[in-house]
């Protein structure tokens, strides 16, 4: 193999893309990963890091451009780590995400008879985020800065706009930056673990336009609190809720456990199709409401509900998918380990007048065995776990339950593939549909249908 050393300048043709969207050039089968390089491009690059099994390169010049390359519309794209694919046409982004799923399920796990559908995309893949979490800091000139982190760092890129956030959020961000500066509010400095203002979090109801503004502070005492609220109301008189969240943990966790309502309601309301949901500052709620409706509609299609089925909604959160399905089911049982989420789910059931739902707090693998002992046998099980996927004990419990169908929503297809191999003992993976919940990024969600053999 050719010698490869740091700072070498080389040329080559990009033959593949990684799941992170990096171009792959190979030298005698040794891969070099190059951010922002695209398949079939002939490029010049510099080796910046060499590892045992791969190297990292920096793109210097593109000698032959891909037909899928586009000019990134965001002026911060080269520095900000929030988006990874703005240089790739949206049609090619959707195809790339489908290829990721094919690679995981067919090429690696050999689910050769399982259908992989086209990625479900957006008509307008911008301004889709209904929740923004914006770090606050100071620059070398001691000026207040707000924006998003540089890739793989906690260096804040000072911004005035973000093209994937709700447009209202950037208006709030810019106004808050001015308010913090004018009122000389203490700013948290992560390295020193001192200062007050850590993050600004903004949530909006996609269909209702209700807005919640949350100030995350390092401690409860905040001398300028009332003045800040007054200025926010002057600028945004239609704001629904203003809250202070206290996070004095000095960790990377954005929000703490305690929140105080400074103005308005404790929650905001949003809708998904015909269902209404109450959302608190800490509720888990899908970021892209438009795509969530498409995701859930595909899940309902897979569930094949006729009105006679008992549905078990595991990892149910605030009850979104369970309540979405309730009008089409005989009864929905939801289980979630987070107590506040179950409280929200129960309230959301009341709001939607769903009398055929039961929500219980606990570990799914334990609660469903209790339900089984009570004679409750689900026809359909909904699974929507966190990125780490399902606990193996849960999978084994599910295998003993033997529902007719399992509909598995995943925000991490790699762990979904791992779990699919365990489910294969008794279940046939019929098909997988990728859904683009986060355009311009490498993230892809999937919904999969498993039928009992």
Swiss-Prot record:
S-adenosyl-L-methionine binds at residues 286, 315, 336, 384. One of its GO terms (molecular function) is 4 iron, 4 sulfur cluster binding. [4Fe-4S] cluster binds at residues 74, 80, 83, 162. GO terms for biological process: rRNA base methylation. Pfam families: tRNA_U5-meth_tr. It comes from the Bacteria. Keywords: 4Fe-4S, Iron, Iron-sulfur, Metal-binding, Methyltransferase, S-adenosyl-L-methionine, Transferase. CDD domains: AdoMet_MTases (cd02440). The active site is at 411 (nucleophile). Its EC number is 2.1.1.-. InterPro entries: MeTrfase_TrmA_AS (IPR030390), MeTrfase_TrmA_CS (IPR030391), NA-bd_OB-fold (IPR012340), SAM-dependent_MTases_sf (IPR029063), U5_MeTrfase_fam (IPR010280). It is an enzyme of class 2 (transferase). Belongs to the class I-like SAM-binding methyltransferase superfamily. RNA M5U methyltransferase family. This is Uncharacterized RNA methyltransferase SACOL1957.
């Amino acid at each position: 193999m050719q010698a490869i050393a740091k700072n070498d300048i080389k040329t080559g043709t990009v033959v593949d893309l990684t799941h992170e969207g990096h171009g792959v050039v190979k030298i005698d089968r040794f891969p070099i990963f190059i951010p922002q390089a695209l398949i079939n491009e002939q490029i010049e690059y510099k080796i910046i890091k060499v590892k045992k099994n791969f190297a990292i390169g920096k793109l210097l010049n593109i000698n032959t451009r891909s037909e899928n390359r586009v000019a990134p519309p965001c002026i911060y794209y080269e520095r900000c780590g929030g988006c990874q694919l703005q240089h790739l046409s949206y049609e090619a982004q959707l195809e790339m995400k489908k290829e990721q799923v094919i690679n995981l399920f067919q090429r690696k796990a050999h689910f050769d008879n399982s259908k992989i559908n086209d990625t479900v995309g957006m008509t307008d893949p911008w301004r889709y985020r209904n929740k923004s979490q914006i770090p606050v800091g100071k620059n070398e000139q001691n000026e207040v800065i707000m924006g998003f982190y540089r890739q793989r760092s906690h260096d804040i890129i000072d911004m005035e706009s973000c093209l994937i956030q709700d447009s209202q959020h950037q208006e709030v961000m810019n106004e808050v930056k001015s308010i913090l500066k004018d009122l000389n509010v203490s700013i948290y400095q992560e390295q020193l673990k001192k200062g007050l203002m850590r993050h600004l979090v903004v949530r909006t109801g996609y269909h209702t336009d209700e807005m919640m503004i949350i100030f995350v502070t390092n401690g409860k005492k905040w001398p300028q609190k009332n003045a800040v609220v007054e200025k926010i109301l002057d600028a945004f008189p239609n704001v629904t809720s203003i809250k202070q969240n206290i996070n004095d943990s000095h960790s990377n966790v954005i929000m703490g456990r305690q929140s105080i309502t400074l103005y308005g309601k404790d929650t905001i309301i949003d809708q998904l199709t015909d269902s209404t949901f109450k959302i608190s500052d800490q509720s888990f709620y899908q970021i892209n409401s438009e795509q969530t409706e498409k995701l859930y509609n595909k899940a309902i299609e897979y569930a094949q509900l006729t009105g006679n089925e008992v549905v078990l909604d595991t990892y149910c959160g605030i009850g979104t998918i369970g309540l979405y399905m309730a009008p089409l089911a005989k009864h929905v049982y939801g289980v979630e380990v987070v107590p506040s989420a179950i409280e929200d789910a129960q309230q959301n059931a009341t709001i939607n007048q769903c009398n055929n739902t039961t929500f219980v707090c606990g570990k799914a693998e334990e609660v469903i065995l209790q339900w089984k002992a009570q004679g409750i046998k689900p026809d359909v099980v909904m699974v929507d776990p966190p990125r780490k996927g399902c606990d193996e004990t849960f999978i084994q419990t599910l295998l003993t339950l033997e529902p007719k169908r399992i509909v598995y929503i995943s925000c991490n297809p790699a762990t979904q593939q791992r779990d699919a191999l365990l489910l294969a003992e008794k279940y046939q993976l019929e098909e997988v549909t990728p859904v683009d919940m986060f355009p311009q990024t490498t993230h892809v969600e999937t919904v999969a249908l498993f039928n009992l053999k």
